[in-house]
């Protein structure tokens, strides 16, 4: 189930593939931090983007983490949640549409300066990440992002010390 299920896309009324996000985290002592990046409009978000044809959904999310945040690590093979956001489409007239994003948890092992400039990747504790993600967003969208941070924090705190290899992908082959 690495690709977004077509039946779910139809059920949600989505005519095009959804976006995928890498919810990047690192352990910082007994706490956890999340890696956020800036959008072109200055909002904070998780590294995200469209599905890439040659990659699975989780690999596409990991590729976004690399391109936007310079992060490499181990990403889970299945989404742990979904959230809503908006996407601006520029053309003859500017339109804003709602999109559903599949969220993949990624344990970051290393981070360097990203390929994309202007992203300003930064680490935040869960409460600060929620505050930053909520800035300049309607409450409907900030609430879904807050739930993703809460779900990720809960999942990380309950994770066994040994990963599930069949459910995770190493990013070594995407270098």
Predicted feature locations:
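Charged phosphate-binding loop/patch that engages nucleotide di/tri-phosphates or the phosphate backbone
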Residues: 136-175
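Acidic, metal-coordinating catalytic segment for phosphate/diphosphate chemistry
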Residues: 1-29
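Unchanged
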Residues: 51-141, 173-175
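Short, acidic/hydrophobic/Gly-rich beta-strand patch recurrent on exposed beta strands
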Residues: 35-38
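A short gly/proline-enriched turn/hairpin at secondary-structure junctions
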Residues: 45-49
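Short, solvent-exposed loop/turn segments that connect beta-strands within catalytic domains
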Residues: 28-33, 92-96
